[in-house]
UniProtKB/Swiss-Prot annotation:
Superkingdom of the source species: Bacteria
Protein name: Degradation enzyme regulation protein DegQ
Coiled-coil segments on the chain, per record: none
Covalent S-S links between cysteines: none
Pfam family, one: DegQ
Natural source organism: Bacillus amyloliquefaciens (Bacillus velezensis)
């Protein structure tokens, strides 16, 4: 039982890290999209 609990803790820890990395990646993607939108808008009005 103790071993199973430790395995579950490890899995949850890894999952938490994966979620954090995914969130950071999505945030970076959103920043890139915002920059592209600003660039596209600037090209339209120039």
């Amino acid at each position: 039982m103790e071993k199973k609990l430790e395995e579950v803790k490890q899995l949850l820890f890894r999952l938490e890290n994966d979620i954090r990395e995914t969130t950071d990646s999505l945030r970076n993607i959103n920043k890139s999209i915002d920059q592209l939108d600003k660039f596209s808008y600037a090209m339209k009005i120039s």
